[in-house]
Swiss-Prot record:
Pfam families cross-referenced by the UniProt entry: SHMT (PF00464)
Gene that produces this protein: glyA
Transferase keyword on record: yes
Annotated organism of origin: Nitrosospira multiformis (strain ATCC 25196 / NCIMB 11849 / C 71)
Residue numbers bearing the N6-(pyridoxal phosphate)lysine modification: 230
Protein's recorded name: Serine hydroxymethyltransferase
Amino acid sequence: MLSSYNTLETVDPDLWQAIKGEMQRQEEYIELIASENYASPAVMQAQGSVLTNKYAEGYPGKRYYGGCEYVDVVEQLAIDRVRALFDAEYVNVQPHSGSQANAAVYLTALKPGDTLLGMSLAHGGHLTHGASVNLSGKIFNAVSYGLRSDTEELDYDEVARLAHEHKPKLIVAGASAYSLVIDWKRFRKIADDIGAYLFVDMAHYAGLVAAGYYPNPVGIADFVTSTTHKTLRGPRGGIIMARAEHEKALNSAIFPQTQGGPLMHVIAAKAVAFKEAASQEFKDYQEQVIDNARVMAKVLQERGLRIVSGRTDCHMFLVDLRPKYITGKQAAESLEVAHITVNKNAIPNDPQKPFVTSGIRIGSPAITTRGFAEFESEQLAHLIADVLEAPTDSSVLTEVARQAKALCAKFPVYQG
C-alpha cells in the first residue's frame, strides 16, 4: 500500500534539494526568457494529480483501454475550451510538445521529399519550420524566407516570389523571435495563389491571440499549432487546430503514428489553463504583457541599444548587441550573475556562431505574471542597460543583483 507520508522530501532527498533550489531560483531571479512563464497552482495541481496513473490510448469515446470515463471528461473539457478560445473547428490536445504538434501537421499535409516554405531560423523562425538540423529539414525539401534588410520586417514579397518559384505544398507562418504582427491573411493569399496549404505555428503568440491582442490565424490557416506554456501560461505541451476536414488524418498522425498513450495529467493541466485564458483577468494580463515589453524596448533604445525591427507589437523583442561590442553569450552570462535571466539569440544575418550570437531575446510574460507593470519594467530595463554597459564590472553586477532581488521580493511568484 502506498503511504501519503512518503513525500518526495523523504523518498528522494537529493531530488528534493534540486527542486527546492529551482524554486528559490525562480523566486530570486527576474525571468525574461520569452518562452517561459509561471503556471498557476491550479495548473500544477492538475498536473500532479492521480490522472498520471491512467492509460488512455485513443480519443474520448473511442479508447483502447477500459476505465476511461473520467479522463474522457477531462479531455473533452480541454477540447471544448480550446474550440471556444480560438473559434476552432477541429482540436487535438494530445501532442506532448509543440514540435510534435508540428510533426503531425507535416505528416498530414506532406509526403517525404515534398517542399515546404518556412521562416529562416536565422531570421527568427523555429527549428521545426524547416531548419536543416531538424527532422522537418531532413525529410522534406525546405525553402526559407526571411526579413527585409532595410526594415527588418517580414519580407512578404520574398515569400510570394519563393512560393511561385518553388511551388511548396505547405507554407509555414509563425516565429520564435519576431516582434511584429504577422499578416496571416497575406500569407493566406500567397498560399491560395499557388494552391498550397497554410500552416501557422502561433506558439509564441497564442496567449495574446486568446485575449484578442494579436490576430487570430484560426479560420484563416488550414492548420494551426501552439504550445500550451509560453503566453498561454499552462503546462508544457502542444495543441493542434484545423479545418474539420483534416480531423481523421490529424488524429491518426498523433495516435498511433507519433505517440502512444496521451499524458492525461498534462491534458488536465491544459484544460485548467484554457479556462484561465477565457477570463477577464487573463485579458488584462495580456494587455500588460505588451505594455511591459514596449516600455522595456523604449528604455533600452533610449539607453543606446538597438532593437531589431525597431519596436515590438507583442511580448518579446531582440536586442542587437554589436554596438556594445559584446556577444549574446557574454550578455546572458553577465545578466544571470545580476539575477536577470535572458537567452542569447541570433539576430538577422548574425556574424556570430549560433552558440555565441550577437543578440539577446527579452520577453515580458513571466515578469507580468509576477505583477510587474510599466514602472517596474522601466526600472528593470535600466538595470539591463547598466549591465550591458559594464558586463565585466563586478560592482555594477552586484548592485544590479541587489536591486533585482529586491524587486523579486516585492513581487513573489507564489505567495504563501
